[in-house]
Amino acid sequence: MASINEIRNLLTTARAEHPIVSSAIAEFTQTYKQAREDSDDGIRESAAFIARALQEHARGWLDNDDMIILLEGQRDLARLRANNAQIALGNRIRSTVIRLIDIALASLVGAL
């Protein structure tokens, strides 16, 4: 799983290109940290997946369209899981995984 510093470095590059996203970057970093430390395997794995996707996007292996499709699919899966989970777990999925995806998507769309 990508470290907090690796994610921060990826997002700092995005901030240099698009200064308006700094508050989104701060929120993403905090939410990513929460997801990595969550007791639920699914939440931790989703955070790792999102981090890997961001790394591959930064390397140029995924373009913006690929990222949007990938993240929207992951968001749909997370919503299904949240809806089928116990209330407390569903709330954590919504506040971490779905929020991470929403921030990443908003940043991508804003960069287009």
Region roles according to the model:
Residues 1-112:
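Cationic, hydrophobic amphipathic alpha-helical membrane-interacting segments
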